């Protein structure tokens, strides 16, 4: 039996691709093991969103190659590179990683990984042969509800990819060139998958894609544009999906990630407010507030539009936690642009916020723009905005003290609230005896920046110990 070890890097969307590969390997009778040193084949599922992601991916590839030369039994081990970096740069990497890599596979080969492994073993590669590339053109694959998949997340939460690809023209982003144009799954396919996950005991469904708000629009008879609002009157839309998911029997959260501000509509706001299973949490990357920056980024929004949208979301969905991300150091960004961004962050007080330093990515229009900023300037602006948000986060956390929250227990002593997505947001530290993978009601007793401390109602602090991570 061939033993395969898989290293998954990058975002949750890449993790789903890894889960699909593992599912197909199991179906083909291959063993998937966590220890790379014991595997016959190692697959590195790479990320190439920004330079640091590519560097991390290449670092893992080189580490696997280095280790397989240290032990006699690993010298015949095969190394396969998959994922976004392979899809985008396989031709370039074929020469630079000639000695390290046996094969490159693209995004459309995640369901073909087992026969590809068998083909690699059937070939006799000489030292002068280039690595085999199975990468095809622009990706067109999209998973279905019955696509074999082995979940790599804890049993109580899952990521569900509702679409693939992106139609947005953001000047800083390479993703549309890697993952292709937007293509939605059917509502029936997503509902079938979620229903099965709930049957298996999943308590949190995280909906993901490059742009979840564009779901269904690619099937409309009248073609939408990058600013078309969610509107079920024109055809299948995200609101259609959310209402059908909300109707599934069971006790679970539906969390909406990766929304685009240009597509938000009053219908979407109303739908979230009317669907109790949809978490009072939204992920809406805004990227900037300066009109000049939004125009150069080609974000299809304006500062005025964004301010109005956030106000409408908060008014229409009481108790909503808004998560966003911004980019600082974009070409041409001035001190005045950063001042405006910081003022906006201060006045809006986002419940959750992250900041990226702009990364000059080959193949993007922004990479060729004049007025590229220095790494020192980017770093200073990142520190300024994050320091501001750290204080805001503490102020937001303070408002939770004394409130009762429903949390999902992640591990002994650690939980997440409705306002906390997996991996990217804060934690709620709770007594260790609360059952993992289940919901619990707790009262917040304290906080530390982004994290909360909480107890079951009526329990006194002396009756429990804080989880080690919080000490």
Curated annotation (Swiss-Prot):
GO terms for biological process: tRNA modification. Its EC number is 2.8.4.4. Catalyzes the methylthiolation of an aspartic acid residue of ribosomal protein uS12. Residues 398-458 form the TRAM domain. GO terms for cellular component: cytosol. Binds 2 [4Fe-4S] clusters. One cluster is coordinated with 3 cysteines and an exchangeable S-adenosyl-L-methionine. It is found in: Cytoplasm. The lineage of its organism: Bacteria, Pseudomonadati, Verrucomicrobiota, Opitutia, Opitutales. Its main location: cytoplasm. It holds the Pfam family UPF0004. The keyword Iron-sulfur applies. It comes from the Bacteria. It catalyses: L-aspartate(89)-[ribosomal protein uS12]-hydrogen + (sulfur carrier)-SH + AH2 + 2 S-adenosyl-L-methionine = 3-methylsulfanyl-L-aspartate(89)-[ribosomal protein uS12]-hydrogen + (sulfur carrier)-H + 5'-deoxyadenosine + L-methionine + A + S-adenosyl-L-homocysteine + 2 H(+). This is Ribosomal protein uS12 methylthiotransferase RimO. [4Fe-4S] cluster 2 binds at residues 166, 170, 173. PROSITE patterns: MTTASE_N (PS51449), MTTASE_RADICAL (PS01278), RADICAL_SAM (PS51918), TRAM (PS50926). One of its GO terms (molecular function) is protein methylthiotransferase activity. SUPFAM superfamilies: Radical SAM enzymes. Gene3D superfamilies: Methylthiotransferase, N-terminal domain (3.40.50.12160), Nucleic acid-binding proteins (2.40.50.140), tm_1862 like domain (3.80.30.20). Residues 152-395 form the Radical SAM core domain. InterPro entries: Elp3/MiaA/NifB-like_rSAM, Methylthiotransferase, Methylthiotransferase_CS, Methylthiotransferase_N, Methylthiotransferase_N_sf, NA-bd_OB-fold, Ribosomal_uS12_MeSTrfase_RimO, rSAM. Residues 2-122 form the MTTase N-terminal domain. Its cofactor is [4Fe-4S] cluster. Belongs to the methylthiotransferase family. RimO subfamily. Keywords: 4Fe-4S, Cytoplasm, Iron, Iron-sulfur, Metal-binding, S-adenosyl-L-methionine, Transferase. [4Fe-4S] cluster 1 binds at residues 11, 47, 84.
């Amino acid at each position: 039996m061939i033993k395969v070890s898989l290293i998954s890097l990058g975002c949750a969307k890449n993790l789903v691709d890894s889960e699909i590969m593992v599912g197909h390997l199991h179906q083909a009778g291959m063993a998937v093991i966590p220890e790379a040193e014991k595997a016959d084949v190692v697959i590195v599922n790479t990320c190439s969103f920004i330079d640091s992601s590519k560097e991390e991916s290449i670092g893992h590839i080189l580490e696997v190659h280095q280790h397989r030369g240290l032990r006699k039994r690993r010298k015949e081990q095969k190394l396969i590179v998959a994922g976004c970096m392979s899809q985008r740069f396989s031709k370039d990497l074929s020469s630079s990683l000639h000695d390290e890599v046996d094969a490159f596979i693209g995004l459309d080969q995640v369901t073909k990984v087992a026969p590809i492994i068998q083909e690699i073993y059937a070939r006799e590669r000489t030292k002068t042969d280039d690595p085999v590339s199975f990468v095809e053109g622009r990706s067109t694959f999209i998973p279905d509800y019955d696509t074999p998949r082995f979940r790599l997340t804890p049993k109580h939460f899952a990521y569900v990819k509702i679409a693939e690809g992106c139609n947005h023209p953001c000047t800083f982003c390479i993703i549309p060139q890697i993952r292709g144009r937007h293509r939605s799954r059917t509502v029936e396919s997503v509902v079938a998958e979620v229903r099965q996950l709930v049957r298996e005991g999943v308590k949190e469904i995280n909906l993901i894609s490059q742009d979840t708000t564009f779901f269904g629009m690619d099937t409309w008879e009248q073609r939408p544009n990058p600013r078309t609002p969610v509107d079920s009157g024109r055809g299948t839309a995200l609101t259609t999906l959310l209402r059908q998911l909300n109707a599934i029997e069971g006790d679970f959260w539906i969390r909406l990630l990766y929304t685009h501000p240009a597509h938000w509509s009053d219908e979407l706001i109303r739908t979230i407010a009317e669907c109790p299973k949809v978490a009072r949490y939204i992920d809406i990357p805004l990227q900037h507030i300066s009109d000049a920056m939004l125009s150069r980024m080609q974000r299809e929004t304006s500062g005025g539009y964004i301010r109005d949208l956030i106000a409408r979301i908060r008014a229409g969905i009481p108790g909503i936690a808004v998560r966003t991300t911004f980019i600082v150091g974009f070409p041409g960004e001035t001190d005045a642009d950063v001042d405006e961004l910081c003022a906006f962050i201060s006045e809006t007080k986002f419940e959750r916020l992250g900041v990226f330093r702009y990364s000059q990515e080959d193949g993007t229009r922004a990479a060729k723009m004049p007025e590229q900023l220095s790494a020192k300037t980017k770093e200073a602006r990142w520190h300024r905005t994050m320091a501001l948000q750290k204080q805001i986060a503490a102020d937001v956390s303070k408002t939770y003290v004394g409130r009762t929250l429903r949390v999902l227990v992640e591990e002994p002593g650690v939980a997440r609230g409705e306002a906390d997505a997996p991996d990217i947001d804060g934690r709620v530290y709770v007594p260790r005896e609360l059952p993992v993978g289940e919901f619990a009601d707790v009262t917040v007793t304290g906080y530390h920046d982004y994290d909360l401390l909480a107890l079951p109602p009526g329990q006194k602090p002396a009756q429990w110990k804080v989880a080690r991570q919080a000490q």
